[in-house]
Amino acid sequence: MIGANNQRDINMVQEIWKDFHDNEPPLKILSLEEAEVAKVSLNAFVVNKIAFVNFLGQLCDGMDNVNVHNITDAIGLDKRISPYFFKFGTPYGGTCFPRDSAAFIRFASNRKRDAKNLKFADEVNADLYQSILDKCVAYDKVGIIGISFKPNSPVVIGSPSSKLIQDLIEKNITVFAYDEFDESFSNLNGLEDKIIKCKTPQECVDKSDAIAIMHPDNKFSSLNTSDKFVIDNWGVLDGN
């Protein structure tokens, strides 16, 4: 997707981007204004999708003979839905989703409309975070596995884990944490000195009373969590 209002700019951007991919992705040329709306709308749509599946996960929590991941796997086979970004897990965060959700809400307001769907998505996100926090505060020692906003990244901007760490520290709860990137800890803006860094995820489990698995990474599936309270919304320990 290229946003430009003249052919010279279109050609220049195409020339730059041709070296960044090996395949031939579809190309869509839009005006600058169309591209801006499209970019924000894309993430806003994904936020709605994530919010729905996270709401569904909370509805299914505690039901007998119900595993939400079996349900979403089945629904995701429908081509109208697809399995992408359709998995119950932790609240969305990072640098793009919260920002673009807020931008779309402002865009709608400027057009004299109320983006109620995205406001509800943000409420679902906040409720999901609160439910994780409420479960953690019942324990004196809490382990956080995965502190960046997504796997394979050291970025903690807008990370639910970083907020969880801060809120637990404020409640005088001892926090143990593991992340595959050392840089993730240095990006915590001072919080890294108030937590206990673990070298392995199993060490994090062993030293904690309760564990929150915040990343959907199957390398955590073999963790021994016996006698621990575990928050595993992603279903990592179930092999989902």
Residue ranges and their predicted role:
Residues 1-240:
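Structural/interface elements that position substrates and couple domains in central-metabolism enzymes
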